[in-house]
Amino acid sequence: KELLRKDNHHGAYSSFEGSPLSKGKFQFDLWDVTPSDRYDWDELRRSIMEHGVRNSLCVAPMPTASTSQILANNECFEPFTSNIYSRRTLAGEFVVINKHLMKELNHEGLWNLELKNKIIEHKGSIQKIDGIPQNIKNKYKIVWDMSMKRLIDMAKDRGAFICQSQSMNLWVEDPNYKNLTSMHFYAWRAGLKTGIYYLRRKAKHQAQQFTIEPNQEPASVSETEGACEMCSG
């Protein structure tokens, strides 16, 4: 309502007339999706049709890699790429741990240095670590434990409420013509405006790991990749 008040003051954007919004059609209407009754959509619809809106596009979720890190959050709507990884910034390099996972493991009395090293050995995944309850494993899957089809399905669910588009990254361990074509067509059939932002793959070679005990098997901590500066704010 506050946005509508400001829109009334400044007036609608120049090509508002004839747009779907001018006809009372929200993005979810264009997707044939029925929203929850949490909000009074009909009142908002009538007000927009009467007064217009100042901006034709308002929502475009992006990765926000740098800004998310400031508050120790993960990038926007993305799953974690690892439950423990190293982060490189202008201030230096430091280790980041999934704070939500660590809190639950602490609550269960499981978190310790040995478990931390096991997570590093398993490249940030907890799926094959004995002793961790299955409900925690189910909750804290990383992207390499997930089906990309499920990520596209979630993007479809969000899409009905996104007027512009979303920067959706996908992860494939060994990308090839077959799986990339399958993903792109699945996203297209789902109605996504943008089929993919970045395609991420696993590194062919793993670096020597110096953060675990010498007598343990070395493995890599996932490192975050460079992000689009426009999206990182």
Write out the residue ranges for each language-model feature.
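Extended, well-ordered alpha-helical scaffold/bundle regions in very large, multi-domain proteins
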Residues: 1-23
